Amino acid sequence: MSWKLTKKLKDTHLAPLTNTFTRSSSTSTIKNESGEETPVVSQTPSISSTNSNGINASESLVSPPVDPVKPGILIVTLHEGRGFALSPHFQQVFTSHFQNNNYSSSVRPSSSSSHSTHGQTASFAQSGRPQSTSGGINAAPTIHGRYSTKYLPYALLDFEKNQVFVDAVSGTPENPLWAGDNTAFKFDVSRKTELNVQLYLRNPSARPGAGRSEDIFLGAVRVLPRFEEAQPYVDDPKLSKKDNQKAAAAHANNERHLGQLGAEWLDLQFGTGSIKIGVSFVENKQRSLKLEDFDLLKVVGKGSFGKVMQVMKKDTGRIYALKTIRKAHIISRSEVTHTLAERSVLAQINNPFIVPLKFSFQSPEKLYLVLAFVNGGELFHHLQREQRFDINRARFYTAELLCALECLHGFKVIYRDLKPENILLDYTGHIALCDFGLCKLDMKDEDRTNTFCGTPEYLAPELLLGNGYTKTVDWWTLGVLLYEMLTGLPPFYDENTNDMYRKILQEPLTFPSSDIVPPAARDLLTRLLDRDPQRRLGANGAAEIKSHHFFANIDWRKLLQRKYEPSFRPNVMGASDTTNFDTEFTSEAPQDSYVDGPVLSQTMQQQFAGWSYNRPVAGLGDAGGSVKDPSFGSIPE
């Protein structure tokens, strides 16, 4: 996770890579009928062509502020699924795998929809033991008619980037059973958003050590919970019995429109079958948080300002990242404005591709940010390991980042520090933008700023020239990042920083062969890396970047709703998994370190007034707010 708190202007992060332009890409390229590459692969529905409505909808005006949600806890229960199925390809994989491995000791009911052995049919292997004739999703072996849980589907619950794996406990792969009301999963609610549930089946043919990264996607559902407790209808004594019944029915209908409350059957998207999921909301009249509300688990990052720890909130059991910042240090470094900007931005934004702020609080010595713990690793880590990404994977990440930057621009925020270290991957392979310490707030489209900040290899020419810059600086950095993902290095990289600055200002943009950077990508990069910010693609808004033919096959509505299954999933075993973090940090004992030095004066403390954040309020003020992402405006279901 990108918690390197001191990374600012003078850092360089990527040494030259050997054989950068000859290494094979990370996944195979899928082409459509016209020979063009499609943006994602791996168990997804086909990607429909984009249209102007999709682009315009995602760059619509800012929606009115959403109503503030009461602080509380969302309680989720999983009950059962029915009618799950594999795609024809994976049906064949399953059947052939288990037949080839000759699981002849198994006894399985022939009916895929029943747990009973009554009426079963079986064939006999040479061992003389009965063997099932069923195949496909139910092809796995059983013991006395029961499936091992490793052959049953599991669910991934995702609420505000808090992600939890839930295994089915019994039933069949086709009709699994979960624990129902016996096991509830609690999520802290800090803003109105949806619950995403994705279903997977373990891949019996996965490579050794692949973990969950090659598991088979079965489908997904989106739940729109009701973030208030149910209000029962009370009979009106002035009405007749019949009229009261009508009024009660109307009341119940209105209640349903406020969101799901209770258990309901929901059909799977991008899959077959349905699943029964229960949700409820409990208001939590909690006082301000303090450090004692969390168990400290591991250190996952450090810097001169403080450190980041993996923590567990005691009342819900959810895992978070707790970022601690020493007040005295940021005061001495004149970093108070940057630190407050990070908190302010995180409190405002509700976007699927940005790490959400859950809470913030303070002590006399420190500031604390409680963020979603996104533990699939930095994009930097994966790019270093693979050297470069194939065109589909690079396009997918670029599209999600484009939506994240568009969202920030909609809130008059320039990001200014886009780089692989500041991009995290979640369990499912979607990106999450983090580290907002260099953001510039309150920037209208025509506004210019002159602050010299960023990371050397990503600095735009206008920033180096010192003539002021606008939001278009973010489109330059997006181009640099796309170039790096495709080739392994930023376009003007040099180990000598001054030479790199000269190249950024003067060197012509060059590309490797077209099998690495295809013509559509080359054209997009040429226009994003235009040294004239007024000519640069994106100068008139994100819509003109989305309209570029490099993104021709992306449906932006689906992308914003995270309906595309990423082609790569990190190997993450659970919410507490820290294997994608540097052992230099995780081996350290987690503790809230004592702060030496004089007590801060009241004047110094006043700089941090309004820091604490427990629930959003409507609006964009510094007190926080959960305002709907402008990218979601006017998108019809």
From Swiss-Prot:
Kindly list the GO molecular function terms attached to this UniProt entry.
ATP binding; protein serine kinase activity; protein serine/threonine kinase activity
Q: Which InterPro entries match?
A: AGC-kinase_C, Kinase-like_dom_sf, Pkinase_C, Prot_kinase_dom, Protein_kinase_ATP_BS, Ser/Thr_kinase_AS
Q: Polar residues bias located where?
A: 40-61, 117-136
What are the positions of the active site? 417 (proton acceptor)
Reactions accelerated catalytically: L-seryl-[protein] + ATP = O-phospho-L-seryl-[protein] + ADP + H(+); L-threonyl-[protein] + ATP = O-phospho-L-threonyl-[protein] + ADP + H(+)
Q: Which PANTHER family match?
A: RIBOSOMAL PROTEIN S6 KINASE
Under PROSITE patterns, the record lists: AGC_KINASE_CTER, PROTEIN_KINASE_ATP, PROTEIN_KINASE_DOM, PROTEIN_KINASE_ST
Which of the residues bear the PTM Phosphotyrosine? 613
Please name the taxonomic classification of the source: Eukaryota, Fungi, Dikarya, Ascomycota, Pezizomycotina
Q: What happens when the gene is disrupted?
A: Leads to abnormal hyphae growth and impairs the production of conidiophores and asexual reproductive associated structures. Resusts in thermosensitivity. Leads to an increase in ergosterol content and a significant decrease in glycosphingolipid (GSL) levels, especially the metabolic intermediates belonging to the neutral GSL branch including dihydroceramide (DHC), ceramide (Cer), and glucosylceramide (GlcCer).
The entry's family comment says: Belongs to the protein kinase superfamily. Ser/Thr protein kinase family.
Establish whether keyword Nucleotide-binding is in the entry: yes
What organism, scientifically named, is this protein from? Aspergillus fumigatus (strain ATCC MYA-4609 / CBS 101355 / FGSC A1100 / Af293)
Q: Which residues bind ATP?
A: 300-308, 323
Q: Which residues form the AGC-kinase C-terminal domain?
A: 552-623
Protein kinase domain residues: 294-551
Which gene is transcribed and translated to give this protein?
A: ypkA
Gene3D superfamilies to which the protein is assigned, alphabetical: Phosphorylase Kinase, domain 1, Transferase(Phosphotransferase) domain 1
Q: What is this protein called?
A: Serine/threonine protein kinase ypkA
Q: How does it assemble?
A: Interacts with the sakA MAP kinase.
* Single Gene Ontology BP annotation: positive regulation of induction of conjugation with cellular fusion
Q: Which UniProt keywords apply?
A: ATP-binding, Kinase, Nucleotide-binding, Phosphoprotein, Serine/threonine-protein kinase, Transferase
Q: So which domain of life are we looking at?
A: Eukaryota
Q: Where is the PTM Phosphoserine found along the chain?
A: 593, 612
